[in-house]
């Protein structure tokens, strides 16, 4: 590729002498020549490097943590032949987030009541007994105890 030609000093002097033309946004094209067409960009793109965008870089996706893969794994363990719609998956994810928040809030209250700075498995177990009803709480406590035992032994 050939290097760009340098601007002539005479053209620079003309621009300096007439500041009124500089203020006018559009210059008249010389007679006999068509004005150069502006470079058109696809919709949503802006000309130049406005906004600090780097050329050629894609916008990084925000990672959203969900329980969707774990819900799906449990579903396949319980009912291997059944699927789940995206709407139902979203509802299940919201349900798990809600239960998690309730358990965490209850465990935090228990730690505060006992003037302890740390939430331990004991606070979690008590909060499960308080938040979840009857038989569900018993099963959750037994599964939680099993998971903690498995974690500490490995």
From Swiss-Prot:
Positions of crosslink type Glycyl lysine isopeptide (Lys-Gly) (interchain with G-Cter in ubiquitin): 150
N6-acetyllysine modified-residue sites: 7, 39
PTM characteristics: Can be acetylated to form H2BK6ac and H2BK33ac. Monoubiquitinated to form H2BK143ub1; may give a specific tag for epigenetic transcriptional activation.
Basic and acidic residues bias (residue ranges): 1-25
Keywords: Acetylation, Chromosome, DNA-binding, Isopeptide bond, Nucleosome core, Nucleus, Ubl conjugation
Primary localisation category: nucleus
SUPFAM superfamilies, A to Z: Histone-fold
Highest taxon in the source lineage: Eukaryota
Record's GO cellular component terms: nucleosome; nucleus
Molecular function, one GO term: DNA binding
Region Disordered: start-end pairs: 1-62
Annotated S-S bridges: none
Subcellular localization, as worded in the UniProt entry: Nucleus; Chromosome
Homology family: Belongs to the histone H2B family.
Summary of subunit composition and partner proteins: The nucleosome is a histone octamer containing two molecules each of H2A, H2B, H3 and H4 assembled in one H3-H4 heterotetramer and two H2A-H2B heterodimers. The octamer wraps approximately 147 bp of DNA.
Function of the protein: Core component of nucleosome. Nucleosomes wrap and compact DNA into chromatin, limiting DNA accessibility to the cellular machineries which require DNA as a template. Histones thereby play a central role in transcription regulation, DNA repair, DNA replication and chromosomal stability. DNA accessibility is regulated via a complex set of post-translational modifications of histones, also called histone code, and nucleosome remodeling.
Protein's name in the database: Histone H2B.5
Organism: Zea mays (Maize)
């Amino acid at each position: 590729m050939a290097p760009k030609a340098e601007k002539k000093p005479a053209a620079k002097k003309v621009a300096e002498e007439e500041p009124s033309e500089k203020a006018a946004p559009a210059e008249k094209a010389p007679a006999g020549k068509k004005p150069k067409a502006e470079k058109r960009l696809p919709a949503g793109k802006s000309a130049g490097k406005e906004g600090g965008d780097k050329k050629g870089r894609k916008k990084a996706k925000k990672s959203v943590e969900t329980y969707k893969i774990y819900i799906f794994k449990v579903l396949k363990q319980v009912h291997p032949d059944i699927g789940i719609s995206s709407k139902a998956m979203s509802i299940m994810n919201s349900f798990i987030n809600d239960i998690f928040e309730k358990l965490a809030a209850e465990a935090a209250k228990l730690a505060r009541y006992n003037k302890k700075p740390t939430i331990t498995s004991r606070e979690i177990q008590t909060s499960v007994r308080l938040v979840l009803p009857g038989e569900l709480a018993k099963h959750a406590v037994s599964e939680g105890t099993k998971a903690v035992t498995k974690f500490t032994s490995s």
